[in-house]
């Protein structure tokens, strides 16, 4: 019988790092149409909830974090804001570290409403803002050793548990988990895994987060859509076995959490996810520049301009025939569009387009025959020039 680790690795062999994230907010056509119709209503709901959200924030700051009144009040107010938090499983008070998967920007809020906890801050932000949002400065920006040391000190003087997201980045939670960071398992040998699931009803089934999105964009959809259900499930606590290494304990917790979510544990780490986000952001910026360039650049109209453009493109794509490039330029009247067609394989690399070079009695084809012979001659002489030293 195959081990869970072997089965998990087999399931993730074909996974790309991009597969662990949502690429688009909404990929369903019917849902997109419904979203357009719903937009005016959504904006009104958004404005009302922004006003209510400010009051919720004030309540969260004024009431003591561990008070039962705060938990019940926040849970009711969050439901009005469209953030419905559901709980399953039993919270084991002997576990001082909660280890959860990360699927949205409000995961820590959902867990904190059910179990007041401490969340390490990974940003260098002012103390007042950190206090308002419930973060604690454990020196994460100053290195792992500082983070682990200060986390251990915090647990000795605080009654509330420490909440950690060992993935380090928000994923879709549908394909696989990011490989866990081991720091929180070094803080305590007893941890309680917490699985977090997010659900939205159809046709408002909009992704809670996409790769490279900003926090305020994610929050916009939380407030604009009717409601979002965040389910928090407490799994049985797990203890580090005798003679079990830190990496083995981390992997075992990850496998347990992945098994509860019915997904696998990927081979990718936080650095791979960060690089994927950078690539996506770069591709989006490049695509925007291309669109702007397409709108602002004049269309090729003069045959002489198209001839010069064809020669420039030929230098970058030497395997394509000049006549094929020139013919596509006549259709697109755009250098960028023709280059994209070449990359997409929409243009044949040969010169043939139905013109054999034979002069027919139809005067309408004479121009095409002339152009075909001209570009054929240019191509032949160009090849001779390129091969002159060989």
From Swiss-Prot:
Its main location: endoplasmic reticulum. It is found in: Endoplasmic reticulum membrane; Lipid droplet. Residues 33-53 dip into the membrane without crossing it. One of its GO terms (molecular function) is ubiquitin binding. It is a peripheral membrane protein. Residues 1-32, 54-390 are cytoplasmic. SUPFAM superfamilies: Glycerol-3-phosphate (1)-acyltransferase. InterPro entries: CUE, Plipid/glycerol_acylTrfase. PANTHER family: ANCIENT UBIQUITOUS PROTEIN, LIPID DROPLET-REGULATING VLDL ASSEMBLY FACTOR AUP1. Belongs to the AUP1 family. This is Lipid droplet-regulating VLDL assembly factor AUP1 homolog. It comes from Caenorhabditis elegans.
């Amino acid at each position: 019988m195959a081990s869970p680790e072997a089965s998990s690795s087999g399931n993730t062999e074909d996974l790309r790092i991009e597969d662990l994230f949502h690429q688009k907010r909404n990929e369903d056509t019917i849902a997109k149409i419904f979203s357009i119709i719903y937009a005016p209503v959504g904006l009104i709901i958004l404005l009302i909830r922004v006003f209510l959200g400010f009051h919720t924030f004030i309540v969260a700051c004024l009431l003591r974090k561990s008070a039962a009144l705060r938990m019940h009040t926040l849970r009711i107010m969050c439901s009005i804001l469209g953030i419905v938090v559901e709980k399953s499983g039993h919270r084991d008070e002997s576990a001082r570290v909660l280890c959860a998967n990360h699927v949205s920007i409000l995961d820590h809020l959902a867990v904190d409403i059910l179990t007041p906890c401490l969340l390490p801050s990974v940003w260098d932000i002012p103390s007042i803002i950190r206090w308002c949002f419930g973060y604690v400065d454990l020196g994460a920006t100053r290195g792992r050793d500082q983070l682990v040391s200060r986390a251990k000190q915090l647990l000795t003087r605080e009654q509330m548990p420490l909440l950690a997201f060992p993935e380090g980045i928000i994923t879709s939670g549908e394909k696989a988990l990011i490989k866990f960071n081991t720091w929180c398992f070094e803080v305590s040998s007893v941890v309680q895994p917490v699985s977090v699931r997010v659900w939205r009803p159809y046709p408002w089934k909009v992704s809670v987060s996409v790769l490279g999105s900003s926090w305020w964009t994610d929050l916009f959809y939380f407030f604009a859509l009717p409601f979002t259900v965040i389910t928090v499930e407490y799994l049985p606590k797990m203890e580090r076995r005798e003679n079990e290494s830190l990496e083995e304990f981390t992997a075992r917790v990850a496998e347990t959490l992945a098994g509860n979510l019915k997904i696998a544990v990927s081979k990718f780490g936080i650095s791979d996810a960060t690089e994927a986000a950078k690539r996506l952001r770069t591709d989006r910026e490049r695509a925007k520049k291309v669109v702007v360039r397409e709108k602002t650049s004049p269309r090729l109209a003069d045959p002489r301009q198209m001839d010069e453009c064809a020669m420039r493109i030929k230098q970058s794509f030497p395997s394509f025939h000049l006549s094929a490039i020139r013919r596509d330029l006549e259709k697109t009247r755009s250098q960028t569009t023709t280059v994209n067609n070449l990359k997409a394989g929409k243009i044949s690399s040969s010169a043939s387009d139905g013109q054999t070079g034979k002069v027919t009695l139809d005067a309408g084809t004479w121009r095409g025959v002339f152009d075909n012979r001209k570009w054929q001659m240019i191509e032949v002489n160009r090849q001779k020039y390129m091969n002159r030293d060989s």
